[in-house]
Amino acid sequence: MSPHSEISFSGSDAAVSNGTSNGINGHSNGTNGFSNGHMNGHSNGNDAPTAVRHGPRVHKERSRHLETAPVDSEFDLICAGFGPASLAVAVAMHDAIAEGRNLRPDGTAPKVLFLEKQPKFAWHAGMLLPGAKMQISFIKDMATLRNPRSEFTFLNYLHSQGRLVDFTNLGTFLPARTEYEDYLRWCSSWFDHVVNYNNEVLSISPENKEAGAVKTFTVQARNGKTGQIQSFRSRHVLVAAGGQPSLPKSLPAKHPRVLHSSQFANYAPQILTKQNAPYRVAVIGAGQSAAEIFNNVQNLYPNSKTYLIMRQEFLRPSDDSPFVNSIFNPEYIDNLWPRSVKARETLLTEARATNYGVVRLELIEHLFEKMYDQKREISDDETQWPHRILSGREIASVDTKGDALEIKVQRVNDGPLDGFVDQETFDVDLIIAATGYKRSAHIDMLKDAWTMLPKTVSGRNESPKGANGWNVETQDGERKLAVARDYRVKFSPGTVADDSGVWLQGCCEGTHGLSDTLLSVLSTRSGEIVQSIFKQ
């Protein structure tokens, strides 16, 4: 989980990491979103710890500016996904109309539909750990930086819950992660009437593309309960599909005792059912999520043995100093966008320490103290410690051994040493991979529109990291899927009508910066997208 991390990763609008996982740790989410409270443990007798529970939500109001429409309507906008990114767009539309702006020429409410694969709104549900706090100011909420007078500010949420004065007395800009998640659910409840939950978008296809400029798109979605596939039509489509968990190839696929970090809080208690049992747990990764889970397991299961396995030699602290943090300012997008592909890649690589493969310093210090205490109290021999950090290691193999998993780890890039490899083997009851996310769902969703994309320029230096788009292979040659500054997909001239199109969110880090996958710019970016779509 990253310090500025903001977009849901267990649903359709997830916070983005940088592509696929990289070896063991995959540079899993860094530290620009949250920090972990160190005193996380509970005591529930011999029962497993339960997930965090929330009090009842009293809010029943709904947006008076966005109205439902029959499913066979031609929608003005369909959003694939309803996590924080799409939620921010709903808020921006509500605010625009509340300010007296017309999003439709006739002044009526726009016909909008959000399609979300989750059964209800959720944000980082698998990482709502006890004691965890945000590491991004509540001012970077759904609205404040765009419109501080909006109904959807975090402060207005506190006021509506009767906690504004008490929160002020905390003297912090950093709410509990669970409270911020409740704020997002409070915001989302205003728009429940225009959201179809349990609907996963499968494809976005242009209609009548042979007849001239495309004016409408067909969006196909599968109902998660019935399996039924339904089609919807819209002039504008926004894709905010989030990230898909990325697991190292060394781990067995779909094994019941192998979880991604996004599943931790929901599923680990179902596997590790007895709090005082001597469970053995391996965590893979070098970022904030990995460090938080490594620490949290020790607190929740006091008799456990834990292993933190990572390719990096050290846990590295995040750089959240104010000058460096300006990379997350909304205006920085305009600084980055005009630069060359090489310049953008260089800058993003330099700035990785703000967000990827890094950990909040206070958590690093806490874990170091734990390691020191073991050395002082048990032995200099780390193999005797119940909690170990295996740095500079990679997984050689994982084999099933009854109800357990046998892990073999070795030094990164180790060659044979006198005929042997420096390898260690141990058994675990659970593996948790905090190894990041892939951000490629939009590519396959738009497959039926690939032939409308411009052809790639022969001889141009193409980036494999999305810094100038994504290359896709068609029967008519290679095409380029890329976006403009306003996040609109750049189709070939004349193929899509000016008042129609497709927009992307949460997968444009290579062109729009590290903030693209984070909460930092949601309020301002959503305003820009609403202006672009509705020609404000």
Swiss-Prot record:
Superkingdom assignment: Eukaryota
Keyword NADP in annotation: yes
Residues covered by region (Disordered): 1-64
One record GO biological process: intracellular iron ion homeostasis
Gene Ontology molecular functions: ornithine N5-monooxygenase activity
Positions bound to NADP(+): A286, G287, Q288, S289, N355, Y356, G357
Record-listed FAD binding positions: E116, K117, Q118, P119, K120, F121, A122, W123, H124, Q135, V201, T517, L518, L519
Binding locations of substrate: K140, N325, S326, I327, F328, N355, S520
Family from the record: Belongs to the lysine N(6)-hydroxylase/L-ornithine N(5)-oxygenase family.
Effect of disrupting the coding gene: Impairs the production of siderophores and leads to slow growth under low iron conditions. Does not affect the ability to infect single, inoculated spikelets, but prevents the spreading from spikelet-to-spikelet through the rachises of wheat spikes.
Record function comment: L-ornithine N(5)-monooxygenase; part of the gene cluster that mediates the biosynthesis of hydroxamate-containing siderophores that play a critical role in virulence. Gibberella zeae produces extracellular coprogen-type siderophores as well as the intracellular siderophore ferricrocin. The role of extracellular siderophores is to supply iron to the fungus during plant infection, and the intracellular ferricrocin is required for intracellular iron distribution and storage with a crucial role in ascus and ascospore development.
Compositionally biased region (Low complexity): 32-46
Native organism: Gibberella zeae (strain ATCC MYA-4620 / CBS 123657 / FGSC 9075 / NRRL 31084 / PH-1)
Cited InterPro entries: FAD/NAD-bd_sf, Lys/Orn_oxygenase
Keyword Ribosomal protein tagged: no
Cofactor binding: number and manner: Binds 1 FAD per subunit.
Oligomeric form and interacting partners: Homotetramer.
Factors inducing expression: Expression is induced under iron starvation conditions.
Gene: SID1
Name listed for the protein in its UniProt record: L-ornithine N(5)-monooxygenase
